[in-house]
Amino acid sequence: KKYLAFLLPIAAMFLSDISLGHKPLISIYIAFLFIIPIGIKLRKKITYFSIFNSSIIAAILFFLITNFFVWINSSPSDGLYYCPPSLMGIIKCYIQAIPFFFNTLLGNLFYCFSLFGLYEIISKRKFIYINS
């Protein structure tokens, strides 16, 4: 049921945004729609290499998509962070976002390796049940 791979994360994010009082940001939902197929493909063959590559690709996609929307929605009232609607504006937008990219990448690598590693440990472990 691949549709659940899309529905559950998007619904969970939407509900958490609403319950926390955050305005849902369409750019984040769109980024997730591009990232979820990477996770679906990753499930077919989980290796250190595939986890590493998937984490990097997901971080790059998230960076490109969300910051493109930041640039599109930028206005002069943003002051120092204003990115004009030009080639230099989008370049400025992406340059300003680089520190956030590294945090996203490190988070992806940490959580992907932790979660997939934990899954591998649990799935290969044999549990012995003792009746008392």
What positions do the PLM features span?
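Membrane-embedded alpha-helical hairpins and interfacial helices in multi-pass inner-membrane proteins
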Residues: 46-129
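Interfacial aromatic-anchored transmembrane helix boundaries in multi-pass membrane proteins
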Residues: 3-41
